[in-house]
Amino acid sequence: MELVVKGADALTVSETTFGRDFNEALVHQVVVAYAAGARQGTRAQKTRSDVSGGGAKPWRQKGTGRARAGTIRSPLWRTGGVTFAARPQDHSQKVNKKMYRGAMKSILSELVRQERLIVVDNFSVEAPKTKELAAKLKELDLSDVLIVTGELDENLFLAARNLYKVDVRDAATIDPVSLIAFDKIVMTAAAVKQVEEMLA
């Protein structure tokens, strides 16, 4: 199949990478796993066994009229432990390489079908100036956009840092979440070829 390239001849690409059916279940599973892997998982609370103090019985068992109590660390008490305390845990999920590649191909194919993938011959700015990139994006009528280049262009990266809903990645660092998070994806022809090789 061929992809239209702005400012150059059409680019011949693999049907299996850019023209396959959309597998929603697979994409969902991979995106959820990717997001889960990004979690720190370092939250922690204290159970009644972790809270300091509480060795002595607060008051005697009978005769005071108060409810019986054996420790000030009880979850019923203020400053006591937490009943089902959170513990540090690893949230990462295993995703097979074949599944990951399949999900990426599904997403790229769907972007092509929805005309959200724009392929350009080259995309760069002369200086690391936000104003220059903003003007270029306005000219192309792009606002919510991920720009993917073959190699990371430092000028382009620095120019995009202060723009809302604009991100710059090189082909090697794109992921399922970044591809579905933006309204439009602008890829250079070199990036398309690189992505195709990565997912082959």
Swiss-Prot record:
<dbReference type="Pfam" id="PF00573">
    <property type="entry name" value="Ribosomal_L4"/>
</dbReference>
<dbReference type="GO" id="GO:0006412">
    <property type="term" value="P:translation"/>
</dbReference>
<dbReference type="GO" id="GO:0003735">
    <property type="term" value="F:structural constituent of ribosome"/>
</dbReference>
<comment type="function">
    <text>One of the primary rRNA binding proteins, this protein initially binds near the 5'-end of the 23S rRNA. It is important during the early stages of 50S assembly. It makes multiple contacts with different domains of the 23S rRNA in the assembled 50S subunit and ribosome.</text>
</comment>
<comment type="function">
    <text>Forms part of the polypeptide exit tunnel.</text>
</comment>
<keyword id="KW-0694">RNA-binding</keyword>
<comment type="subunit">
    <text>Part of the 50S ribosomal subunit.</text>
</comment>
<dbReference type="GO" id="GO:0019843">
    <property type="term" value="F:rRNA binding"/>
</dbReference>
<dbReference type="InterPro" id="IPR023574">
    <property type="entry name" value="Ribosomal_uL4_dom_sf"/>
</dbReference>
<keyword id="KW-0699">rRNA-binding</keyword>
<dbReference type="GO" id="GO:1990904">
    <property type="term" value="C:ribonucleoprotein complex"/>
</dbReference>
<comment type="similarity">
    <text>Belongs to the universal ribosomal protein uL4 family.</text>
</comment>
<dbReference type="InterPro" id="IPR002136">
    <property type="entry name" value="Ribosomal_uL4"/>
</dbReference>
<dbReference type="InterPro" id="IPR013005">
    <property type="entry name" value="Ribosomal_uL4-like"/>
</dbReference>
<keyword id="KW-0689">Ribosomal protein</keyword>
<protein>
    <recommendedName>
        <fullName>Large ribosomal subunit protein uL4</fullName>
    </recommendedName>
</protein>
<dbReference type="GO" id="GO:0005840">
    <property type="term" value="C:ribosome"/>
</dbReference>
<feature type="region of interest" description="Disordered">
    <location>
        <begin position="42"/>
        <end position="65"/>
    </location>
</feature>
<keyword id="KW-0687">Ribonucleoprotein</keyword>
